[in-house]
Amino acid sequence: MSRTTDRRGGRDDSLQVVVVDDSPFMRGLISDLLTDAGVAVVGEAGDGAEALSVVAETRPDVVTMDVEMPGMGGLEAVERLMDETPTPVLMLSAHTAEGAEVTFEALERGAVDFFSKPGGEVSAGVSRESDRLVEAVRSVAGADLAAATRDRRERDAAGGGPSAAASGASTPSASAASADLDGPLTVVIGASTGGPNAVERVMSALPTADCRIVIVQHMPEAFTPRFADRLDEASAYDVREASDGARIGSGEALVARGGSHTRIDSYRSGRLRVNLDEDDSQSVTPAADVTMRSAAEVVDGPLVGVVLTGMGSDASEGIRAMADAGARTIAQSEDTCVIYGMPKRAVETGGVDEVCDLDDVAGAIVGGEA
């Protein structure tokens, strides 16, 4: 049964959340974790239909939404919510391949980000990740909903899927792009919140050229293989998840594996090799800083660093290192970011050459002088 609540906790009433899950136990657990961190839980719901009513009544800052629920599930609820009472949504997803697939669909429908529940419904796993859950909720609260729902609105207008939404991006032709490249181009892209849709948009608009690309998206290990598959389907590039010792050349891309850092280990004759490690000194894994710094140290050919939407400061040190090594550097504009965190911090280092709207990033990658 849907209900409003008063779990304000006494520390910080500025952030208000509605918790949606078909399991009363999970609703209580998530609500208690948020309340203990000073987040006000102002409502709960057991399915999507109830969620629509509670959100309309309470007008929260964030909704945490389970995916699989009886009646109206999370996917339909997200879409209806964006139409009726637009509110930032954090999906709570099972830590499985199936959970990854439905989560990407939820992001396409307007959800801002997702929290992967360790072990699916195992409550102890969620408790161990309480700090990460609270951080995710706070991050989502600051999202630009217009940017988060842009792909869906354009897809609906075009009457097609994500590729139809991306087709409006202005990019040079493949032949023009190749003519602009002074030798093999290596590209490192870093992103976090809002990144899956943004990276897909850039990759689908990027023309075939003599590029090799490494993508670092903050994402758990169970999700990165499917993310690589989606990019492979959406773009002209051969995209796969990074593995230890993997090599790529022209027209190929790697997605950093969740749970490991991807370091560029060597670069010879236009081909680069990566190694994976589990260094826990970084605040996030995988970290764009690690990949970007290694690119700056190893790649002696034309090099481009790109920072897309995301919370936090990852990629700021890496983009500075790439700039110091002579790379061209690009950051996504505030107006088109779901979260203007990572690009903002990158710009503040003084190491960003160009700030671009999302639809101009692909053209900037291949159109400048490296």
Locate the predicted segments by residue:
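Conserved acid/base catalytic micro-environments in cytosolic active-site loops
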Residues: 3-7, 11, 24-32, 44, ...
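Extreme N-terminal starter segment of soluble prokaryotic enzymes
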Residues: 13-16
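Conserved acidic carboxylate
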Residues: 21
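A generic structural motif
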Residues: 37-42, 58, 209-212
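Acidic, metal-coordinating helix/loop segments flanking the phosphotransfer/catalytic sites
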Residues: 44-62
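Negatively charged
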Residues: 65
